[in-house]
A protein has these predicted regions:
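A structural signal for short, hydrophobic/glycine-enriched beta-strand patches
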Residues: 1-115
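A transmembrane-helix-recognition feature enriched in membrane-embedded lipid enzymes
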Residues: 111-135
Length: 135
């Protein structure tokens, strides 16, 4: 979230969409009070999506948001570990031009189990699309 906020330029033409947020998330409390984001910047430039529960749904939720806003390209910000699968799904589902921007999640060493889990999810995602769309 902080990296996305930092990408909003001073002209405030860039928008930050945070998808897959829990229904209890209060943007004013978290973004303004806890993270000390500028209230004016939050109000003009940050929107929150509460509908998605996984990466697949994040891509769809972002697609609908972008269509509504007439946006055709996005900067996809997520962790380095999660980026390959997120980028794949966003490219397959969103219909947007996707530029990846991976951020380090402050872990010096990522546990092997976590890397394996993410790799398996990526392989399964690709298998689903190959089977479903015969790509």
């Amino acid at each position: 979230i902080i990296e996305g906020y930092n990408q909003i330029d001073s002209s405030k033409e860039n928008k930050l969409f945070i998808s897959g947020v829990d229904n209890t998330f209060n943007s004013e409390v978290v973004l303004i009070n806890m993270l000390n984001f500028d209230q004016e910047k939050v109000e003009c430039c940050i929107e929150v999506g509460y509908l998605s529960k996984n990466t697949y749904e994040n891509a769809l939720e972002t697609r609908y948001w972008a269509l509504e806003k007439k946006i055709n390209s996005i900067l996809l910000i997520t962790s380095t570990l999660h980026m390959p699968r997120a980028e794949f799904l966003f490219n397959q589902l969103s219909g947007l031009r996707v530029t990846p921007h991976a951020v380090n999640n402050n872990q010096q060493v990522i546990p092997f189990e976590k890397m394996l889990e993410e790799y398996i999810k990526l392989v399964i995602s690709k298998m689903v699309f190959i089977k479903k769309y015969e790509i």
